[in-house]
Design a protein with these regions (language model features):
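A broad structural signal for short, well-ordered beta-strand segments within beta-sheet-rich domains
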Residues: 12-14, 30-32, 79, 139-145, ...
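A short beta-strand motif that forms the metal-chelation/ATP-contact edge
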Residues: 5, 76-86
């Protein structure tokens, strides 16, 4: 799972747990999609949020976004990675679509202007997925934006050569859809 959160003066004021689905056929946990809300129980999600707050405290991360990747084993979360930033998978946009909290805007307003954006999460009743448009490296991009999606973006134009980054399956764009 992934936890995307936000801290103000050491307090975790926002936390959302998402299911992080990776390609099973490739090494290294190459991400395929994120799903909100998590399919794990509320108890597991609460443990993830508490562990995120504890990790932030121990690492002295006090203000701004926090991203934590965790593995769940027997209903118990274990940290894989913690970093004081927005995640690298455009989760801020999925979170904005899902519960009307804009972590990107909140980060800029708070960290640059020292102003805290007021927010009140209002999760929609739908499960949403952020799904990456992926292709093999060095192939010619064949994808296109999904007009049925809530949001869709391609990093390449049709026919562009897909750059090799991980050598297995490269991100070429993403869509946000209802499941």
């Amino acid at each position: 799972v992934s936890v995307n959160g936000y801290l103000v003066n050491g307090e975790l004021i926002f936390s959302l747990v998402s299911d992080r689905i990776s390609f099973s056929e490739y090494p290294g946990g190459i991400i395929k999609e994120h799903i909100v809300p998590t399919g794990f129980s509320n108890a597991v999600a609460s443990k993830c949020s508490a562990l995120t707050a504890d990790a932030a405290h121990e690492l002295k991360i006090t203000n701004g976004p926090i991203y934590v990747q965790m593995k769940i084993v027997d209903e118990q979360p274990y940290i894989i990675e913690v970093t004081p930033r927005l995640d690298g998978c455009h989760m801020w946009r999925l979170i904005k679509q899902y519960c009307r909290v804009d972590l990107l805007d909140m980060s800029f307003q708070h960290l640059i202007n020292n102003a805290l954006v007021k927010f009140s999460p209002s999760p929609c009743n739908d499960k949403l997925v952020l799904r990456f448009i992926c292709q093999a490296p060095n192939s010619l991009f064949e994808g296109k934006a999904d007009e049925q999606a809530m949001y869709s973006r391609c990093y390449y134009d049709m026919g562009d050569k897909v750059r090799e980054l991980n050598g297995y399956m490269e991100k070429c764009g993403y869509t946000i859809k209802k499941l």
